[in-house]
Amino acid sequence: MVNSKGKITDSDPGSSHLLLNGLADKAGKNQDTEPENSLCSQYEEKVRPCIDLIDSLRALGVEQDLALPAIAVIGDQSSGKSSVLEALSGVALPRGSGIVTRCPLVLKLKKLLNKDEWRGKVSYQDFEMEISDPSEVEVEINKAQNAIAGEGQGISHELISLEVSSPHVPDLTLIDLPGITRVAVGNQPADIGHQTKKLIKKYILKQETINLVVVPCNVDIATTEALSMAEEVDPDGDRTIGILTKPDLVDRGTESKVVDVAQNLVCHLKKGYMIVKCRGQQDIQDQVTLTEALQKERDFFEDHPHFRVLLEEGRATVPCLADRLTSELITHICKTLPLLENQIKENYEKITEELQKYGSDVPEEEHEKMFFLIEKINAFNHDITSLTEGEEFVGEDECRLFTKIRNEFHKWSLVIEKRFQRGYKAICKQIERFENRYRGRELPGFVNYKTFEIIIKQQIKELEEPAVYMLHTITDMVQAAFTDISEANFAEFFNLYRTTKSKIEDIKFELEKEAEKSIRLHFQMEQIVYCQDQVYQCALQRVREESDKGKDRKINSMCSKEVSSVNISLSDIFEHLLAYRQEATNRISSHIPLIIQYFILQVYGQKLQKDMLLLLHDKDTHNWLLKERSDTSDKRKLLKERLARLAQARRRLAKFPG
């Protein structure tokens, strides 16, 4: 309703007509006087723009992206739903047995504030037709339903738009939905009941939709399927209005029960109930006009001993219903506009970001295609450079490729340390075994170099396969990263992506072999036991100092028994092994990662970039390389259409006086 300050509220469903149609009617009757002109201006400024805004957004197709404020009309078959819509719109809609409304019908009613002639328009799919006579509406709606849903009793989710402009209709937009059916009859699909409920729920589930539930007065309201569906999606009744029809068919003695329902005392809805008496089948056969039917309706409620009170409360007659619905729709639109604006903004930003992934359209001109391909390849090469230099952009929960590789190198250093430190006691036994086998004429206390050399070579040799395994692991990581970059840049061009992926694999196999060859060569060189004299002497001195100070108790504790039973030279050999191991560890732990970085990052990236630039030389392949996936161009087109819709919607919302 509208309170004393002119604000629309939900508390009293009956008194809202004082602002809306009453406002418009007064403005239309006395357009020459200043007060009425003021009312007309208020009507034009407050009511019309709200509904026109939402209708324009719906016409743009914004409803494909997000929900718009709407009033959806639902009801069981034979509930009187069509009669209510006819009374509101002033035009005859399809009638008959079975499912009459087979497609959602957007009924846009526009009140003309002057004496302009009645006009209508039917729109669906790519078809649009102006209508000059109200009697043509029913035929055109039937044609539209047959074109969309086919001949027969099938239904469709596709919208039909009917626009009616007249001095005798309220400013209102309704969505008429198929009547609820339970059993398939005739040539209806076997699951017609499921189909209709699914279609209805698609609309009434949305929080932006006011559900207008049409219920006959002569049925038990508690068992009504339409009201049950509304309660399921709106359990608190916040956005549901009940419309009671056929009060003239109520059995004698049950009128008070109908009044209780209408006064919201039985099945409570926060927005309450309205009651109307529309044309019945006999009225139609008697050719009672809609205007005459409205007068008969008012006379019925004024003269009825039980229902008169509902008229006095503003809960009865079609004109009161029209005003109430317009009031509700305006309130609902104003309430949801801020949220709608935010949703449009968020969707616009999201689609813009998604569209960037698909890039721009491929040019038609050959020379432009060359520049387009150059840009694509340069962008790819730039990403490869960033990756190999450890400067690529990564998400919040991701890490750079170089970080992953560095972790593998750290694991490598731990492997070396673990292999060299493996079992001091076992090494002591190994020293003893080699000493017994290879000791020559040396006197006790002299180190046998052959023993030292064989042991150190064996320890280093054991690291060769782990090094090669690390190479393969890192190569696979780099290949996967390069492939991801290729997909990110070329996914929509399947030939270019496939060509790039093939090059990534070919270069990988080539350089992996070279890197493995270099690693194995390094380990072959490590079989030459060598270290600069000064470096080795310093390392040996450090080992002996640690041994003397008792810091390296492992030598003394683990080998004391072995030394006492064999020869003092075992301790000396162990010290030499530790000294040489330190220097060998430094060499191997650094040089193997250098080999991998050189071949698998630096050379791999450079060679791939050069091979990609070579693609530009063969102009005959440009069209083939830039051939898009059909779904890519379709998706880009769809995203652009959505973006254009939302951009227009944002502009219209920005201009709305609000």
From Swiss-Prot:
Q: Which UniProt keywords apply?
A: Acetylation, Antiviral defense, Cytoplasm, Endoplasmic reticulum, GTP-binding, Immunity, Innate immunity, Membrane, Nucleotide-binding, Ubl conjugation
In this chain, the stretch annotated as G1 motif covers 75-82
Q: Where is this region: Disordered?
A: 1-20
Does the entry feature the keyword Acetylation, yes or no? Answer: yes
Instruction: Check the record and name the Pfam families matching this protein.
Output: Dynamin_M, Dynamin_N, GED
The GED domain is annotated at 570-658
Q: Where is this region: Critical for lipid-binding?
A: 551-554
Q: How does it sit in the membrane?
A: Peripheral membrane protein
Superkingdom is Eukaryota
Q: Where is this region: Stalk?
A: 365-628
Q: Where in the cell is it found?
A: Cytoplasm; Endoplasmic reticulum membrane; Cytoplasm, Perinuclear region
Q: GO cellular-component terms in the record?
A: cytoplasm; endoplasmic reticulum membrane; microtubule; nucleus; perinuclear region of cytoplasm; plasma membrane; presynapse
Q: Show the segment(s) annotated as G2 motif.
A: 100-102
Q: Report the residues modified as N-acetylmethionine.
A: 1
Induction behaviour: By type I and type III interferons.
One GO MF term attached to the UniProt entry: GTP binding
Share the domain note from the entry: The C-terminal GTPase effector domain (GED) is involved in oligomerization and viral target recognition.
Describe the task this protein carries out.
Interferon-induced dynamin-like GTPase with antiviral activity.
Query: How is this protein organized at the quaternary level?
Result: Homooligomer. Oligomerizes into multimeric filamentous or ring-like structures by virtue of its stalk domain. Oligomerization is critical for GTPase activity, protein stability, and recognition of viral target structures. Interacts with TRPC1, TRPC3, TRPC4, TRPC5, TRPC6 and TRPC7. Interacts with HSPA5. Interacts with TUBB/TUBB5. Interacts with DDX39A and DDX39B.
* The family this protein is said to belong to: Belongs to the TRAFAC class dynamin-like GTPase superfamily. Dynamin/Fzo/YdjA family.
Could you tell me what this protein is called?
Answer: Interferon-induced GTP-binding protein Mx1
